[in-house]
Amino acid sequence: QATNVASALGADWLNDLGYFRTASGEIADVPVTASRVSYVGEAGWEISCQSRDAVRLYQALFRQGARPVGSLAVSAMRVEKGFMSYGHDIDTDTVPAEAGLDFTLDWSSDFIGKSALQMAAGSKPTKRIVSLVFDDEMVTPLGNEPVVGKGGLIGKTTSAAFGYRLGKPVALALIDAEYARDDEMVDIDLAGCHVAARVVTGPAFDPTGRRMRKAASA
């Protein structure tokens, strides 16, 4: 649908934009900058323009079929995709390896905290952020629920939502690394009731990222 909207507005250059690329152009005669990135795990763009042009751009997109969505929908989709939110899933105390973000470190450059990370580089993280999938469609995790393993408390959920693409509730959780294995079963304490969840070490939805990386015109 997004590609059809772009084409209808004479902005086919958006459809030619490669994944993780940024370009400037026009949509409905409005100068914009578009980035081919995704916070929800689908092919699309993040588009910015001058504030004075925002209403005109919005109206042009709306006339061609684009529809606004709420923040809860966006949050649910990013939890399905395993995208972490700063302040919810990660913060200044998070070690990059715990979040699977150590690949972003440039050891050839200097940065704040480098010496501390170098000292810890030889040891495996004691905690990991994972996805949790619930088979019970009726449970309603909200985040910050205790996660329980065979040995007792092993962590907590950090974000949660109903995953409409999966058809199941999903959550992100920071848990003891020994439980961070695909298909490991853990319990979530929901208001005193233990509910089973399955561990997924990557994104619960589209783990390869094919949907958001595919050619926008495909």
Predicted regions and their residues:
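Conserved, structured C-terminal
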Residues: 1-218
